[in-house]
Amino acid sequence: MALLQIAEPGQSPQPHQRRLAVGIDLGTTNSLVAALRSGLSEPLPDADGQVILPSAVRYHADRTEVGESAKLAASADPLNTVLSVKRLMGRGLSDVKQLGDQLPYRFVGGESHMPFIDTVQGPKSPVEVSADILKVLRQRAETTLGGELVGAVITVPAYFDDAQRQATKDAAKLAGLNVLRLLNEPTAAAVAYGLDQHAEGLVAIYDLGGGTFDISILRLTGGVFEVLATGGDSALGGDDFDHTVAGWIISSAGLSADLDPGAQRNLLQTACAAKEALTDAATVEVSYGTWSAQLTREAFDALIEPMVARSLKACRRAVRDSGVELEDVGAVVMVGGSTRVPRVRDAVAEAFGRQPLTEIDPDQVVAIGAAIQADTLAGNKRDGGELLLLDVIPLSLGLETMGGLMEKVIPRNTTIPVARAQDFTTYKDGQTAMMIHVLQGERELISDCRSLARFELRGIPAMVAGAAKIRVTYQVDADGLLSVAARELASGVEASIQVKPSYGLTDGEIAKMLKDSFQYAGDDKVARVLREQQVDAQRLLEAVQGALDVDGERLLDAEERMVIDLQMQELAELIKGTDGYAIEQQTKRLSQVTDAFAARRMDQSVKAALAGRNLNELEE
């Protein structure tokens, strides 16, 4: 039975006039659902009064178990109990195999590249597992609120790529949820703290969850949230702290690292319990089998220090990307259960020179903020005015051009939603089709970027090279999902694609791509210039050869032809090398020695066009 909500006079939520919408934090370790009740955003409890739902799903032959009971069965039934499924969202089968023994499951492949977990209930994809968690949250919300939901705002890490976001939307659809918006977790946290109404200036959102780390720098101005930069590590979280403590136990106890799935789960649960105990205690007794030892907070801090340092390095990079200084940041919001670790809080305070905001439960803050946004998007009037959320894309989007070059159409950290168009042309005479290769990344060469999709534009009118104009439009919606369209402007023929890869980036790939873009920036620029010079030279060679085939014998004498042939041979040889300056100079020389030939061809074309026409016809 739904509980009756009693409000103070003048604060009634007018239930019959409000549309029911919720915010959902679909987390790696835990998940929550929240909603606005009596004007306040709060997490919704289950029948036992618990607001946190462990992100654990256990499959039986005839039923599915979700939450705390499933989590407790993980050691006894590791092959049928799925934990931390968020880490598998948008991944390929080859990606999860690289994780090796970290995942005690049997994986099988499907028709898509998506990994399936082999259970007694049959193969289960990460999308299906996530959907089972979302179904429980949806049912909890509808029972508590006493009605059917019009939709939900689901939060995702700011660093989630296109495939991971799409997988999240697919899971929601499977769970019977209408997704009003995918909202970046850092932005949701800022909304929860009411920073949209009370703050002006720069805010850092430090989000360390079970499986991912995000850092976002936001500028708040009059209710407008502008995300200046995002960063993080998609392979850093509380799970990694657990694995580190588990490694310490194995080493200290002299155990074999080759454990069966049940023993592995049991070990990780022991490590997690020790980590959580050290949040309040200075020392904890750790027992595993017949072995036991003391683990001090000081020793634990030393174990996790490399990971804490990695998070701070990402913070400094995000601050640099946003064009501000650390001391300019006015507030730091802590998000995610792993920010309860004292060393994490101390390190963040030291880095930013101020104590972080921790008043709202870090496990609940994201869902609370998402619920506020959901209520607004559902069409309910929000006290205190509207807020505008301006999120950004984490990596540049572009396409392949001749020479294997990456041409950026939308740079990283561009505010979304966004649409950008750029004009391109054909490379060869008579070209009637063009392959559009959609890429993501920061490097200059396509071999160093990630391929998202390919599609072909056909029906381009046959023209000389460079005459056709193809407009390529990239559009990223508010959920961070990309669609690309190409249109030939003269004929109107067009083609488009919604980019929906079957799997996403591997662990840490986004962070690695950003790191590489800085590390190899100089080399990339040199390589790009070389490729461009090679393409220009090749284009000139083909154009000259085409002209020679048509008019060479008629308009050139033997000596002129020999000079041009020699210059062409020299340029053709230089293109095979890596001396960009020499290619550029030889291209200029070939262009100069063919100037007279080009002028004669132009004269011949004009004479042919005017042949048989009188002056009066021309004046008309």
UniProtKB/Swiss-Prot annotation:
Cited InterPro entries: ATPase_NBD (IPR043129), Heat_shock_70_CS (IPR018181), HscA_NBD (IPR042039), HSP70_C_sf (IPR029048), HSP70_peptide-bd_sf (IPR029047), Hsp_70_fam (IPR013126), ISC_FeS_clus_asmbl_HscA (IPR010236)
UniProtKB keywords: ATP-binding, Chaperone, Nucleotide-binding
Q: Drop me one GO molecular function for this one.
A: ATP-dependent protein folding chaperone
GO biological process annotations for this chain's record?
iron-sulfur cluster assembly
Its signal peptide is none
PROSITE patterns, alphabetized? HSP70_1, HSP70_2, HSP70_3
Q: Does the keyword Lipid biosynthesis apply?
A: no
The family database entries (Pfam families) matched by this protein are listed as: HSP70
Similarity section = Belongs to the heat shock protein 70 family.
- Which NCBIfam families does this UniProt record tie to the protein? HscA, PRK05183.1
Tell me, what does this protein do in biology? Chaperone involved in the maturation of iron-sulfur cluster-containing proteins. Has a low intrinsic ATPase activity which is markedly stimulated by HscB.
What is the recorded name of this protein?
A: Chaperone protein HscA homolog
Q: Which organism is it from?
A: Pseudomonas fluorescens (strain SBW25)
Gene from which this protein is expressed: hscA
